[in-house]
Structure formats: C-alpha cells, structure tokens
Amino acid sequence: MESPFSPVLPHGPDEDWESTLFAELGYFTDTDDVHFDAAHEAYENNFDHLNFDLDLMPWESDLWSPGSHFCSDMKAEPQPLSPASSSCSISSPRSTDSCSSTQHVPEELDLLSSSQSPLSLYGDSCNSPSSVEPLKEEKPVTGPGNKTEHGLTPKKKIQMSSKPSVQPKPLLLPAAPKTQTNASVPAKAIIIQTLPALMPLAKQQSIISIQPAPTKGQTVLLSQPTVVQLQSPAVLSSAQPVLAVTGGAAQLPNHVVNVLPAPVVSSPVNGKLSVTKPVLQSATRSMGSDIAVLRRQQRMIKNRESACQSRKKKKEYMLGLEARLKAALSENEQLKKENGSLKRQLDEVVSENQRLKVPSPKRRAVCVMIVLAFIMLNYGPMSMLEQESRRVKPSVSPANQRRHLLEFSAKEVKDTSDGDNQKDSYSYDHSVSNDKALMVLSEEPLLYMPPPPCQPLINTTESLRLNHELRGWVHRHEVERTKSRRMTNSQQKARILQGALEQGSNSQLMAVQYTETTSISRNSGSELQVYYASPGSYQGFFDAIRRRGDTFYVVSFRRDHLLLPATTHNKTTRPKMSIVLPAININDNVINGQDYEVMMQIDCQVMDTRILHIKSSSVPPYLRDHQRNQTSTFFGSPPTTTETTHVVSTIPESLQ
C-alpha cells in the first residue's frame, strides 16, 4: 500500500552509483572504532537542536528498553512478513561537520520477505508466484569496545541461522546540492531494520514513503555516532510501520523520513532470496515538483482572479443593461401618454375641420351678389348713366338772327365753357376707347373701364397762374382789335363797351362778342348800327381743327414763321415746344418806348401732331384776305407796319 506522504518514483539503479556506494561502505569497514568514540561527544552536542518528532503509531516502551536484546544488536528475527512490513529509510538532518551529503545503508542485511516483482520500489508490491521460506538471522558477535553511552554501533555482518544470508548491494543516490563540510568529521551512519509483522508471508508487502514537507532546503545528514534504529514492537498492525530513533534528544524540524522497503526476489539459479537494493531518495526531486506545484497554484490563483474579474464585469454590464432597460421603459410609457394626447387633439381638429367644411350656399350666394352689385354700382352703371346724360344733354342753341346790342355775360361764358369741357371729355373717352380697339384685344370686357392717362403731379396754383396768363393774353388781343376796328362808333357804343369791361373785371376771363357789320353800316353815321351775326362762319373751321374746350389754339395762316429746332432730346420725356407770339403790353408804364417788342412765350409739351386738310370755305373771310396777302408776299418784301398790327386776331367765345 502506497504511503500518502510521498509520490511514487521509478527505480532506476546505475552501476556507477553501486561502485561508489561499496567504496563508501569499505571506508566505514576499515575505519577504526576509536574514531567513533572520539567524535561521539561532538555529535552528541551537535544534535541537540534536531527534532525527530514523527506522527507514528504508539508502541510499547518495554520492547525498546536498553535491557532488551533489540538494543544490544541489530538483528532480524525470523518472523513472517506481512504485506505492510517495510524497511524505513530515514533522512538525517544536515550537519556542517559532515564529510559528504550522501546517505548510507548497511552492507549486509538478512531480511525475511516475500518475493516481489521489482517494478517499482516506491509502488505497491506484487504477490510472488512462489512461496518463500522463513529466514533466520544469527546474532552478530559484538566487541567489548563497540558499546557507547547512548547506543550501540552496528556490526558489519549479519548471519542467517538456517540459510546463508543475502547481501544486497545498496545504491547511493546523489542528494540535493552539496554543502561545504569539514573533511575531518566522519559521515553519519543510518541503520535501517525491517519490522516483523503478524501477517502471513503469502500476503503483499506495502511500501511506505514518508516525503519531507515542501520546504526549500538541503538534506540534513547525521554523523556517524548517531544511530537510528527501527525496531518492531510485539504487536503491530499491518497498515502502519513503527520508527524508533535513538542517539540523541535533538529534533528534526520540517523533515519527514522516507521509509522504503527492500523487496525480496527469488533467484532462479540457486533458489535463494535476494534482497533488492533500497534507494534513498533525496529532496532534490521534490524541489522540482514543488516548483511545478507552486506554478500550478499561481496559475489557479490567476485563473480565479480573472474569473472573478470577468464575473464582476459581467455583473456590472448586466446592471447597466437593467438600468438602461428601466429608462427605456419609462420613456416609452411617457411617449405613449404624449402620443395618446396628440391623437385626441388630432381627432378634435379633424372633427372641427369637418364641421367647418359644411357648405353654406345661402351665405356664399349673398356674398357673391353683394360683391357684384358693388362692382356694377361703382364702375359699370354710373359710367353708363353719365355717358347717357352727356349724350342726352342738348348743346348750346345758336342765337336767333335778330338785332341785339353788343354785350356779353359772365354766366353765359361759364355755361359755354362747361359745355365745351363736357363735350371734350366725352370725345376724349371715345378716343381712348377707339385707341384700345386698335390693340390686340378685339373685344372689350363688360366691366372693363379704361384707366385715366398717366399724368404727372401738377401744382394747382401753378396751373391757375398759367391759365390766367393765357386767357389774359388772348383777351388783350381781342380788346385791342376791337378798339382799332370801332374807332368810328358812337359814344353809346363806347359806354356799352366800357361797362362791359368793368363788369368783366371781376372774373379772370372776359370774352368779347365779335360782330361783323357790313360796309353800309360802317359808313352810316347813325347811332344805332345793325349787327349781322354769322354763327356758321366759324363752326366749320372748328370742326376741321377738332377743337377741344380745354386747349388753347394758336392758328396762323402766315408763312413767315421763324422755326428753331431742338439741339438735344431726352427719350424719357415728351418733346417740348416754346411759342413766342406778339403780345399786348399790360401796363404801359412798365415798358414805355419804341425800342422793345412785347412778345408772349408759351412753353408746352408736344402731345400729338397730325396733318389737317381744311376747306377754304371754312376759313373766316378776313383770314382769307390775310392769307392771300401773305402768300403773295411770302418770298417778297415783308409786310408793312400797319398790316402787322392786324395779323394776330382772336375769335370771340360767343361763336365757339
């Protein structure tokens, strides 16, 4: 049975080790016993600190007493060996005085053991196929000087009583790294004795290996006087061996004794039993195994630490996942609530939209009718009514052909001017519509109203001033012409004309009726002259020139005009024209002299130009005479001064 204290090591003996072992044993045989007695004291003092406490089974003290025959000599009794009986190999503690670091065994051992197969000295023994006879030991002869105080020195020869003794060749194994020792101190001797057992010989023998504890250190060797004896008690169990150590009270700390049995093998030649050589194992190999165990333990510690860290990381990861899951669940619940509220609001909005989409035909129809009525009243019907009223309004009736005094009225002049303005506006409207007809649009829309022409901003005060200037210019020409033609009239006519001038001074415009008299009336000297009005003499001329009421006309039948063209032209504005005509001096006190000519300059913008064909019959008679005279003298000498005074004439407004 294998011991639990040491691992099983294979048995591999070598011849060099055997020769070395026998050389050492011969040295111990030739050495005198005096060396043991001389060095006994030194070894006795050196082993006081050793500790040989071993946890072994108790034994009987009387068997190990000094008076017993076991203490006098070391011998093996011829007893049957049990399978549990074995030889014990005790590793002695290290001493600084030892000569070598090897372990020694006795040269001759007579052992009674069963035949075993030498498969392994440290393994379980096998049953022998043949029976082994019991062996008997002879008691060795002891000398008188070999006994010491504390123990007996072993004899070198053990004899068998009935059969020749078996002398095995012990093996010498190298121990741990050698230590430097003193050569004068002899080596220690270890005596190993097998223990008899009560078991029969036919049973197996077990090897008990006591391995030292895994402590780093070298093997402790015992000196020569120290004797380790292993004796068997009277009754021992086959399971555990008994180890007895004598020779000193020193203790062996942190060391375990290896007990190695010596298996007996039967020799096929002579039929005797041969004891195999026991092997004393040192602690060298245990150091390698200790290193391997230490590395294994370190790997286990590292593996456990890494496993712990991985479990910790996994736990932290799981905790993080749980926290994220909780946050996601809470956020999901919140989003579900918000989604529900938004869905409810959307349903409310959709329902409200459906209610608002319900058509209301009455309201819509009323709104459309109101808009149409507003458009018709503001644009269409009002303009149509105005045009109809303009068309229906009668024109100014011509004066009856009868005799009447030369007079004029401001009210009549105002009515006449208003009528002319309305007529001109009506004609302007029609002209605009005709111009629009010439464009791409073939038909005018029903409610289309032509926009008024784009006019620049006009200062009202400036417009009134210009109008007053032009009307005064025309009026003064008419007054001067009337004075020159009626120098021969009576005082009554002069008073009437004076009253008319005073009455017209209140208004800005004063029109003078033009009366055409015959040569008979001119030559007559009566106070009352017949006035023959000819209203149709100018109407044809007005139609020919398309007269408008809001425009001043300057008509000349002379050919001797001075025309000056413009030197520059701006494309963004209308062409400008300035008309310079003779004028009547307003106040003779301002300019009094014959060195200056009074002229009127009229600045205007050209709106339109066209060629007119006027019948000669429509031209007034007095203008025809001037036309003939000016035509004949166009390329001749200029007219006289008397003729130039009558060139510019005015048309009375009563005939317009």
UniProtKB/Swiss-Prot annotation:
Regions of this protein lying in the Cytoplasmic compartment: 1-377
Region Transcription activation: start-end pairs: 1-137
Residue spans of biased composition, Low complexity class: 78-101, 111-121, 632-650
Record-listed cross-link Glycyl lysine isopeptide (Lys-Gly) (interchain with G-Cter in ubiquitin), residues: K139
InterPro entries attached to this UniProt entry: ATF_bZIP_TF (IPR051882), bZIP (IPR004827), bZIP_sf (IPR046347)
Annotated spans, Leucine-zipper: 335-342
Ranges where the record places region Basic motif: 295-326
Cross-link Glycyl lysine isopeptide (Lys-Gly) (interchain with G-Cter in SUMO2): where in chain: K75
Basic and acidic residues bias locations: 404-427
Protein name: Cyclic AMP-dependent transcription factor ATF-6 alpha
Family (UniProt): Belongs to the bZIP family. ATF subfamily.
Compartments, as annotated in UniProt: Endoplasmic reticulum membrane; Golgi apparatus membrane
Superkingdom classification of source: Eukaryota
Pfam family, one: bZIP_1
Primary location class: endoplasmic reticulum
Domain bZIP: start-end pairs: 293-356
Residue span of region Interaction with THBS4: 455-575
Region (Disordered): 75-169, 391-429, 632-656
Membrane-spanning ranges: 378-398
Record organism: Mus musculus
